[in-house]
Amino acid sequence: MNSSNTGAPEAAQAATLEAFDRRAAEQYLRGQWIAEEHLMRAIGGPRPAGIPYRWEWKSVEVALDEATIALGPVDTARRHLTFVNPGLMDRGSATTHTISAGFQLVKPGEVCWSHRHTMSAVRFVTKGHPDAFTAVDGERLPMEDFDLLITPRFSWHDHHNSGDADVVWLDGLDIGLLQSLGAVFYEPYGDDSQNVRPSSSEGIGTRSHWLRPTWERGRESRLPIRYPWKEVNARLDVYDLDAGTPYDGLALRYANPVTGGPTMATMDCWVQRLAPGFDGKSHRRSSSAITYVISGSGTMVTEDETITFNRGDVISLPNWTNFRWTNDSEIEPVLLFSMHDIPALEAFGLLYEEPEAILNATPAPINPTPSLNPIYRPGAFYDQDEL
């Protein structure tokens, strides 16, 4: 059989289809056959959005100083440098495809005027001061070293530095996620400062404590919360040095103090401790993460490169990227703060991990005292989450 004759009908068919595709496009229609190649690429999982990348604190610190000179005095929340992932340059201010992070600096005496937006925000203070605070929906949240502050969606917030030294923090906002949902709203307050409650006893954040007023209905969401570092650090000391998993080391969630669930509906925050000499196992998740190095040094090893990190550095980890942590020191632990888009994926049933389920996969410690003379069935009268 003449192969050239066989190819002629196929070429004619291809030309017919190509002509149809052009006519359909003029009517803003597209055949599913055009998308088939994109579906085939998803076999085995998505392609990571962006690349693993590290921003060195020494370089960022210089850039912040230069920005201070270039901008001059400011009264807005704009002395902020966003970490733009080199693999996401077409998405604007994207550190991962869902979260944008960056450092913000407020000079002594400055007030960054009040505004609100539908993006939720976390603020991890890297250089605090006893006289600095953020006001969130009328509540004063102090900003001391390594404190974590929560600004829920559409909460009024303004930043104040009444101290005598610069204050710096790491911002994280779910901008990419909200942009993809078409849900970005913004509103300036119209004045530098919002009204602040006269007493902390009136605060919603105060009511997130485990001692709460009996005469009030409690709130579970949009809580303006501060997680003081001194309390977080004390909780780390409760756990044995080798506690945790061979993947993440000791990873503790900044839980919503009322529900016990994730930090926010769209973002979860962790503090991690990598024990001296930690050499973690490789794993990947369908979620993305941004990590700040509180102390120590080590590496994040991916399939393509080894990223070295030191104190103050920030690392972007794209979704579905194999990686593992190591701690260079045989003496000192590594401490990490990180933000994740895990809750958003969990809400849609789309959180996936390899090589095994890690998050929420291990039962909580069981009652260590079984009955010596059993009368009832083991586990009788227990709750399901105890079994």
Swiss-Prot record:
Residues 103-171, 271-337 form the Cupin type-2 domain. Optimum pH is 7.5. Its cofactor is Fe(2+). It is an enzyme of class 1 (oxidoreductase). It catalyses: 1-hydroxy-2-naphthoate + O2 = (3Z)-4-(2-carboxyphenyl)-2-oxobut-3-enoate + H(+). SUPFAM superfamilies: RmlC-like cupins. Keywords: Dioxygenase, Iron, Oxidoreductase. GO terms for biological process: phenanthrene catabolic process; protein homooligomerization. Its EC number is 1.13.11.38. One of its GO terms (molecular function) is 1-hydroxy-2-naphthoate 1,2-dioxygenase activity. PANTHER family: 1,2-DIOXYGENASE PROTEIN-RELATED, CUPIN. Homohexamer. Dioxygenase involved in phenanthrene catabolism by mediating cleavage of 1-hydroxy-2-naphthoate. This is 1-hydroxy-2-naphthoate 1,2-dioxygenasee.
